[in-house]
Amino acid sequence: MQGVQEQIEELQMKMAFQELTVEELNQEVIKLNQLIAHQQHQIQLLIGKLKAMEPSNIATQAEETPPPHY
């Protein structure tokens, strides 16, 4: 059976490892949040560009006359 000191040291090592893991995961979450914010901004820019585009000269399907074989 392990001594109390060895058990304490093992718990301290596990805790240090978990703290490191939590910090690494936190950094990844921060990066992903920044990426999401950037992508949302890009989507908003694209939406603005699409709304600003001139309407197409091509007729919609409802406006098209059916082909002669109908």
Curated annotation (Swiss-Prot):
Coiled coil: none
HAMAP family recorded: SlyX (MF_00715)
Family: Belongs to the SlyX family.
Protein name (Swiss-Prot/TrEMBL): Protein SlyX homolog
Organism: Shewanella sp. (strain MR-7)
Record gene name: slyX
